[in-house]
Every structure is written in structure tokens, then in C-alpha cells.
Amino acid sequence: MVAAAPSNKERLPDMMTSIRLDQSGRVEIIDQLLLPHSVVWMPVSTPEEAFDAIKTMRIRGAPAIASLAALTLRSYLSSSSSPVSSSSSSSDVISWVGQTIDYLQSSRPTAVNLGEAMDRIRAALKDSEAQNQTAGDIIQRVKKICGDVHDEDLERNMKMGRLGAEWLWKKRGGGKKGLKVMTVCNTGSLATSGYGTAIGVITALFQEDHLDTAYYAQTTPYHQGSRLTSLELTTLQIPACMICDTMLGSLFQHEDIDGVIVGADRVVKNGDTANKIGTYQAAVLAQRHNVPFMVVAPVTTIDLSLPTGAEIHIEHRPAAEATQVRGLDTETGKLSVVRITPEGVGEGDKPWQRVYNPSFDVTPAELISAVVTEKGVAERKEGEKSIDVASIC
């Protein structure tokens, strides 16, 4: 009797991870600036080092940077280098932790997950002060929250992956062996604590044998797609195809795309979504071709305090990130950075030297078919221009 071939679920290789703890509990991250050509783990021991890693995008992805900030704070509070300890006064602990989380939050203002994690700590500090807790108790409480921020992410990502895959298969799976989907940026294990958001849905489709091909955009100028998503999908051996950002229209014209699946850095009350630059254009094309457009993000990414996307602060990145590119020299085998524009572009103040380099764009809710969180799926109703994301918080 011939044994049945293993399913995709059974043969899925181990996923990558962006954050780990060494034997002493010290935080380490993969330097994502060196990926995919070199995997280098770098220690992050202080809040200043965490701030720098987030600001320089050595780690990126809204859930991942929240985890890094939280885990680094926990590790630092346990170290001999910490300026506060159980022997400090409660007021000193509250003051130092408060200043530190403000500092960490300023490293990436668009990503709401980081702010949500820091707000959890702020609320705990306020409550601890009201209860007159000891310095030691306050420190332990903060450390517990920091650990929870990281641990909760993986579980909810797997829930979102399942919910999103089920929703899209129900919408487009009839009579098909597998779906063709498209994604932007990097939303997998390198951007989260594990499994991923949008890539989590793609992985779930693959595990259920419901995936034909996952197309992913290069996502210039930082190449999160060509550098990071490509690495994750090839590691997982998921059928995938890279496309240049300028090829999205051609892809929709010539392939029967079943869905666009993206992550988010912030989803506001009406469903407007801030995500990596290039998401909006994918949404416009998806609507033109009647393709479902799905946003996948944890509840921590939803910001009900902002009514519309017009209020979202959009971070602009240095011009050098658009005028230069980092890669592997195929002749020398060494990593190098090369300029791809004429000298002076992005470096001077002349009208002909300017570079427009926003890190995010905002996709209006009227272009989004559904928002998926770990709590459920909120669909945009026919003819409506908003989505009731509060129902899945």
C-alpha cells in the first residue's frame, strides 16, 4: 500500500524569527539591513540600542518593534545597568520607566502597536502609583506586561491566519484548486513575533492546500518584499513569484488574482489603513479588477481614537534610502551600497534635488473589502465607505 504524500501542513519548514533571547535572557535581533545575504544576530541591551535598531530599521514591522521595545525594557530592568531597582523609591521607578517608554515610542510614531504596548505600561504605572506599590512590585509588574506583549503576538497571528484564509477561500475558492494572491511589504515572522499577519494568511492557505501562487511586490525603496518576504517564502517553500512595484497593473491584467492581502501599521475607526508605501496603489488596482482586498492586523493595531486616516501621522524617511541601494556584489561576493541617482539628488536644497520618500500611505476604507483581527472579520458592506472595525476589537 502506497503511503499518502505529506500535506503542506506536515512538511512546512521551520519559520524564521526576528527576535530571540540568549541563555542569559539578553535580547538579540536579526539585523534586517543585511538580509537576505547575511543573517547576523545583534544584541540589544539598552533602551538606546532598541531605539536605534527601530529607527534605522534593523528591525521593522509594527508587532516586532513593539516586542523589541518591551523585551529590551524587561531585560534592562533585570540588569545591573538599570538606574532603578527594588531598592529605589517608587516615584523614581515610575519616573524613569515613564520617560523611557516615551523615548521608545518616539522611535516609530506611525506604528500603533508600539504605542499600545507603551500605553499598557503607562496604565500600570498610574495604577501602581494609586495603590502605593513598592518599587519592586512596580518593576515586576512592568516586566510581566513586557513579556505579555511579545508572547501574545504569536497566538493571535495564527488565529488571524486561519480566519483570513477561511474568509478568502469562501469568497473565491469555488471550483478552484488553489488561489492566486498578492501582497505588499513584509508581514511574516520577520515583522512579528512569529507566523505573521498577511503572510500568516498566505501560510494558512498553503497549509490547507488552498494556495496556487503568492505574488509579492518588491516594495521599494527599502525592498522589504524582494529582501525579506522573498527570504521567508523561499524558506517556507511556498509557491511564490516576485513582481516589481510598477508591474502590479500588468499582473492584474494577465493573471486571475483572487485576493490582495496586506498588513497594517495603523487602522483607524472608519477602517482607513496606514501601511507600507505602495499599499494604496494595490488597493486601487484591486478595486478596478474586482479583487477582494484584505487587511490583516491584530487588535493592537486598531486605533479607535482617530476618526479617519487623515489624522494619521505619516513618517518620511531619509532621501538616501531612495537614492541608494544595498546589495551583494556578484563579482566580489561582498555587501555594498551603490548610488542609483545622479550625484546631488536628495543631498541639496535646490528645487531639482528633492526626493519624496514617505514610508507609508493611507488606503481609504472604501477600497478595502475586509479587515481581519484575532477577534474576527469585519466586511465592508456594499455601497458603504467605512468598515465597523470596532466590532472586531
Curated annotation (Swiss-Prot):
Top EC class of this enzyme: isomerase
Top-rank lineage group of the source organism: Eukaryota
Record site: Transition state stabilizer: 185
Gene3D superfamilies: translation initiation factor eif-2b, domain 1, Translation initiation factor eif-2b, domain 2
Main location: cytoplasm
Pathway of action: Amino-acid biosynthesis; L-methionine biosynthesis via salvage pathway; L-methionine from S-methyl-5-thio-alpha-D-ribose 1-phosphate: step 1/6
Keyword field contains Amino-acid biosynthesis: yes
Reactions accelerated catalytically: 5-(methylsulfanyl)-alpha-D-ribose 1-phosphate = 5-(methylsulfanyl)-D-ribulose 1-phosphate
Biological-process GO terms, alphabetical: L-methionine salvage from methylthioadenosine
An annotated GO cellular component: nucleus
Keywords: Amino-acid biosynthesis, Cytoplasm, Isomerase, Methionine biosynthesis, Nucleus
GO molecular function: S-methyl-5-thioribose-1-phosphate isomerase activity
E.C. designation(s): 5.3.1.23
Annotated compartments: Cytoplasm; Nucleus
Function of the protein: Catalyzes the interconversion of methylthioribose-1-phosphate (MTR-1-P) into methylthioribulose-1-phosphate (MTRu-1-P).
Annotated protein name in UniProt: Methylthioribose-1-phosphate isomerase
Upper lineage: Eukaryota, Fungi, Dikarya, Basidiomycota, Agaricomycotina
Gene giving rise to this polypeptide: MRI1
